[in-house]
Swiss-Prot record:
Protein name as catalogued: Bombyxin-related peptide B
PROSITE patterns linked: INSULIN
Family according to the record: Belongs to the insulin family.
Listed transmembrane segments: none
Domain of life where this protein originates: Eukaryota
InterPro entries: Bombyxin, Insulin-like, Insulin-like_sf, Insulin_CS, Insulin_family
Organism expressing this protein natively: Agrius convolvuli (Convolvulus hawk-moth)
Complex and partners: Heterodimer of a B chain and an A chain linked by two disulfide bonds.
UniProt note on tissues of expression: Located in 4 pairs of medial neurosecretory cells in the brain.
Amino acid sequence: MKFVLVLVSLALLVSLASVQGNNYCGRHLSETLAYMCPELEGASKRSGAMGAAAMYGTRGWRWAAMGGNRGKRGVVEECCYQSCTLDELLTYC
């Protein structure tokens, strides 16, 4: 019974954290994006034989910097200067 109560409490905390939103800045922002977007792993590494097309796709670095189709607001404006939810942060993957 206690296990179920702890499990429900943990699920509630996780859901509240994703709804409430947090500020993600600097290293915390980059580490969170790296954790949430494993397909982007290695894109920020300077070593290796990756070309620009492999790192940023065929649309180039400007498209990646803008967050794809997110418009003019970038991930820093959205999640550092203001709070954002984990769902909003996932849109930058």
